């Protein structure tokens, strides 16, 4: 009977040692503070305590920054693209409108006035007679040359509302011999339009102007409004 017990003890000893070893291992693990379900937390803790190299952390932050910039660019690019499309549509509409306007036939440019087959430009600035003549030449016209009584009345009334205005009449070549800028002389039929006592050539007054209800001679260096004149354009009949 004692031999059986002794044999039983011998048979149980390896199992007891295994249990003791297992128990000791568990206690040892607990003693070091590890738990079977705490692996992820421990790994995260390692990252937090700077076990990841600093270069990798910087790289991670750089990648995040780049991604943020890309997202912001895409967000702001959408309204910008819509605005560009709207501007393009407006530009195309204006281009089509301009093409339609250009096809319209006008006897005179937009800022000119038509009268009896001629176009007249009434300046809003003031220049000397020579500068006024140059301004007219630059637009393919000349300082106004009066050809009829109707034209004279039209120009006199228009100038009266605006102020003293140059015409294309001078006597620079020979005193008291007045001629137009197209080379034609002043005829006797137009002498009646001089104001009373004019022209008097008071102080080298060699250029004519519209003044109030008649003509006046004055210094060519004075600054006045001016009138340009050119032939109107013939439009084809529709």
Swiss-Prot record:
GO molecular function: carbohydrate binding; carbohydrate derivative binding; D-mannose binding; metal ion binding
One GO term (biological process): regulation of T cell proliferation
Annotated Ca(2+) binding sites: 198, 200, 202, 205, 216-217
Induction cue: Down-regulated upon activation of dendritic cells.
Tissue specificity: Predominantly expressed in dendritic cells. Detected at very low levels in lung, spleen, lymph nodes and bone marrow.
CDD domains, alphabetized: CLECT_DC-SIGN_like (cd03590)
Residue ranges, Cytoplasmic side: 1-51
Cellular location(s): Membrane
Function (record text): Probable pathogen-recognition receptor. May mediate the endocytosis of pathogens which are subsequently degraded in lysosomal compartments. May recognize in a calcium-dependent manner high mannose N-linked oligosaccharides in a variety of pathogen antigens.
Protein name from the UniProt record: CD209 antigen-like protein A
Source organism of the structure: Mus musculus
